[in-house]
Amino acid sequence: MAIRKYKPTTPGRRGSSVSDFAEITRDHPEKSLIRPLHGKGGRNAHGRITTRHKGGGHKRAYRVIDFRRHDKDGVDAKVAHIEYDPNRTANIALLHYLDGEKRYIIAPQGLKQGAIVESGANADIKPGNNLPLRNIPAGTLIHAVELRPGGGAKMARSAGASIQLLGKEGTYASLRMPSGEIRRVDVRCRATVGEVGNAEQANINWGKAGRMRWKGKRPTVRGVVMNPVDHPHGGGEGKTSGGRHPVSPWGKPEGRTRKPNKASDKLIVRRRRTGKNKR
């Protein structure tokens, strides 16, 4: 993937860029693998906003991605197409299995149209192949990793993401996450070899607010420019700094959003670096 920059013909075009979509080989999805997707606008079943800054955006269809490939062990598949997916930053690959079934997977870096991929304990160590962690050599970069055996891929699924397999000891494998965190995972968990493709997506300059609205993202208004009735940082004469440590609109201090008693935390060997320790 390469980034194509626009000429500054308008204020919105100045500095903006877009993917050249050179890797994409088809401009429409497989009909049997799409589902209707109804936007919720950040609302819950009661109609109340539970997630701010969501709403609008272009109409989309959901592409059904295969995050559990264990039922296709020993069945080779040919990469028929590399496609765009509006629901994620990564591209997706359409696989045609030898038994006639078609499925989507996240497209790893370097996977080309016409390549053959496989899954199972005896699969080769090459991009796109899916196998248990116990069968992957230490030092390999992987993505689409399960947290629990058979639970489906949960980690490292966005564009450019990868996890490094550091080593294996007993029934656990040590993984270095994209955040720098080191975590232990059951060696029976599956992963796909390689890094997620479309890494240059992070360098796209969206250029104008309207392009973010096309994506379904609404404006994020700072608390210090609100009135006191709307935010703890609001009000004051002229420009102010808020007068207190940063908080949410409901008065909760910013940061520390991780659940403190999550069951899987006992498998974290080293925490990610945050704040002052991020060096």
Curated annotation (Swiss-Prot):
Q: So which domain of life are we looking at? A: Bacteria
Q: Does the keyword Cytoplasm apply?
A: no
* Entry GO CC: large ribosomal subunit
Name the SUPFAM superfamilies on file: Nucleic acid-binding proteins, Translation proteins SH3-like domain
| InterPro entries for the chain | NA-bd_OB-fold, Rib_uL2_dom2, Ribosomal_uL2, Ribosomal_uL2_bac/org-type, Ribosomal_uL2_C, Ribosomal_uL2_CS, Ribosomal_uL2_dom3, Ribosomal_uL2_RNA-bd_dom
In this chain, composition skew of type Basic residues spans 37-58, 269-279
Name by which UniProt lists this protein: Large ribosomal subunit protein uL2
